Each structure stands twice: as C-alpha cells, then as structure tokens.
Amino acid sequence: DVTNYVMLDLGQPMHAYDLDKIEGPIVVRRANEGEKLTTLDGKDHDLSVEDLLITDSPNGERGSRVLGIAGVMGGLYGEVTAETKNILLESAHFDQVSIARSARRHKIPSEASRRFERGVDDQLQPAAAQMAAELLVKYGNGEPSEHPTDYNTVCNRRPILFKASEVARVAGLDTDVNTISDILTDIGCTVAGGGNGEFSVTPPSWRPDLNEPCDLVEEVARLVGYDEIPVTVPPAPVEGKV
C-alpha cells in the first residue's frame, strides 16, 4: 500500500522486497538465454536477453537469482507477505525504451511500466524512498535503516542552444528576449546567455519532453497564449496561364 501510494502521489514507481528472503549484493543486469521468471501475478515468463532484471546473489553467486523485471513487475520470490518482518525498498530510474519493450514483450502493462515508459523525473528517487520509509515508520511502526544504499549514476541534462528568433519563425509570435527568458525560467529551466538573442537552456529533470529548440518554442507559445498567435490566411493558389 505504501509503495503504491507514493507512486500515485509523486509519480515514482517503487517496489518492496522481503529482505530476509534475499541475499546481497543486488545486481541489475540483462537476462541470460533460457532464464525464466514467475511474476507477482503468478504467470511464468521466458525472459529475453534484452530484458533488464533485478537479481540477488544466493550462496555468493553474484546476480544468479532473478527477483523481477526492472521497472515492470517483481517476481513471486521475495514478495512481501503478512509474515514479512524486514523490507528492502527499491526506488530507481530505468531507461524508457527498455521498460516499454519488456512490458510489451511479456504483455505486462503494469502501473510502473506505464509511468517509466512515459518518463519519470530522474532526480525523484531519493525523495520517494524517504517518503515511503517515513510512512512505514508512522503507520507500520517500522525502524528505518541508518545506511541506505544509493547508486547515483544519473547523467546531467544536455543544454539546448536556443535562438530567441525561433519563436517568431516557428510560432509567429513577436516576443522579446526578456519575456522568453522569464518564461523558460518559470517552467524550471536554467537559462544562460541571451545577450545576442541566443540562450543555453538546460531543462529541469522533471521535463524529459524538452529536448529540442522546437519544444521550447511550444512552451513559450503555450504560456504567452495561443490566442496571441496572429491569424494569417494562406494565399490562394494561382493557376498557371500560357
């Protein structure tokens, strides 16, 4: 209930494991040929070498046991039950394309996969884990670990070189440089430059849809107002004459 609540509130999918059933280290890897998994819904799946997996290491064999398909659905082994006493919380970020392909390959349109394939804020994971832990402490009388595990491999967003003149060229809006800069800043972007009408714009982590200059033009047009775009009647075609 806690992991589902956090997902619905923050948009970050999470998963919980019965800590007493698994053995570290936890390994994230691609599936090997011939591997299988029984998911939480009781269905058996033949895994593809393209599937990204969450695994543990029983008897010291690193990554040898499959716990779930990353970002899609957990396995039956390691699930939390009424007898569970210790919980391992997973709050992670996975590649959109990889998750979408695995979900479709195995016909598992889970709530988690739907969110991952549409893009999840890659800076949200610590906050989601903290929120889940606090809820378990408050309502489940749990005791949080003092040493959470954190593997931070998030890449910084690539800045977009943006010319203010693109707003007029693409959207037909006569918008001054300061207004454009203010709008992009208001939606969370980091804006640098602008003296010669060119900006270096770094989108915020929660806007994975902002990747190209045209995406920024769309944001400016949306916030200035589509009703401000001038209406121009296309010229009528002229028939050729001899």
Task: Identify the residue ranges that each predicted region occupies.
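RNA/tRNA-interacting regions in translation and RNA-turnover enzymes
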Residues: 2-242
